[in-house]
């Protein structure tokens, strides 16, 4: 080989080093991009990028993260706080995203707009491109895979949000064997939120997830229960107090008060005013 000819081994080694360096830089950047965006003590602005109306007063709002590869950074079972200045007063309310934390670039909120709901009306007034201010995570419940054998859930209305967050994380994780039983109460059949998603989960995981619907005003030929969630309904469709699991509750205050009393009737310990991780009866 002539002294002026390039050495193939040197060329190959140089190219390999360049490729490895590029891969290393990409991995570092990717890891940085996938870091959590949320900050517990600082409100940050996130733009509304999509609004899907489910009913006359309920929407799924999708908010964008700074980068398409960012994740929100919300542990399963935790929620976020939305803050706003309304009529000169600082108002803060908590909401649970229904999107998974491994869904990158955005997060989804299921919100029902109430006439007297300051934050819900504030969010509903937003157009695509407008921002809301969010901080988090917060909350006393953090789910980890296989932490219990069986979870019982009772949800009312938009109280389905934290339940959906938890059950989605469980049922999309092939290594998590936790069973889930959900009793979901609403006024009318049209009020049942995320029904298609819940029914699909029940169909795909018949041995691990069961959902029972309860309506105040039921149509003819209704297959679920009618009226309020009673101790009898709970006893039939939820795990009993002696099983390895928790009873999770989320819904309107009057409903939650009644569910706490029903739980005591069935032998569950009395729920604390502020629930903590490990409580047999946990209220979101």
Swiss-Prot record:
The EC designation for this entry is 1.6.2.2
Compartments, record wording: Mitochondrion outer membrane
Q: Which reaction does it catalyse?
A: 2 Fe(III)-[cytochrome b5] + NADH = 2 Fe(II)-[cytochrome b5] + NAD(+) + H(+); 2 Fe(3+)-[Dph3] + NADH = 2 Fe(2+)-[Dph3] + NAD(+) + H(+)
Q: Does the keyword Transcription apply?
A: no
Required co-factor(s) are: FAD
Where would I find the FAD-binding FR-type domain in this sequence?
41-144
Q: What class of enzyme is it?
A: oxidoreductase
Q: Which of UniProt's keywords are assigned here?
A: FAD, Flavoprotein, Membrane, Mitochondrion, Mitochondrion outer membrane, NAD, Oxidoreductase, Transferase, Transmembrane, Transmembrane helix
List, in alphabetical order, the Gene Ontology terms for molecular function in this entry. 2-(3-amino-3-carboxypropyl)histidine synthase activity; cytochrome-b5 reductase activity, acting on NAD(P)H; NADH dehydrogenase activity
Pathway assignment reads: Protein modification; peptidyl-diphthamide biosynthesis
**Single GO BP term:** protein histidyl modification to diphthamide
Q: Which residues cross the membrane?
A: 8-28
A Pfam match: NAD_binding_1
The question of whether Flavoprotein is a record keyword is answered with: yes
- Chief location bin: mitochondrion
Instruction: Note the PANTHER family from the entry.
Output: NADH-CYTOCHROME B5 REDUCTASE (PTHR19370), NADH-CYTOCHROME B5 REDUCTASE-LIKE (PTHR19370:SF184)
- How does the annotation summarize its subunit structure? Monomer. Component of the 2-(3-amino-3-carboxypropyl)histidine synthase complex composed of DPH1, DPH2, DPH3 and a NADH-dependent reductase, predominantly CBR1.
Q: Which family does it belong to?
A: Belongs to the flavoprotein pyridine nucleotide cytochrome reductase family.
Function per UniProt: NADH-dependent reductase for DPH3 and cytochrome b5. Required for the first step of diphthamide biosynthesis, a post-translational modification of histidine which occurs in elongation factor 2. DPH1 and DPH2 transfer a 3-amino-3-carboxypropyl (ACP) group from S-adenosyl-L-methionine (SAM) to a histidine residue, the reaction is assisted by a reduction system comprising DPH3 and a NADH-dependent reductase, predominantly CBR1. By reducing DPH3, also involved in the formation of the tRNA wobble base modification mcm5s 2U (5-methoxycarbonylmethyl-2-thiouridine), mediated by the elongator complex.
What is the official name of this protein in its record? NADH-cytochrome b5 reductase 1
What is the scientific name of the source organism? Answer: Meyerozyma guilliermondii (strain ATCC 6260 / CBS 566 / DSM 6381 / JCM 1539 / NBRC 10279 / NRRL Y-324) (Yeast)
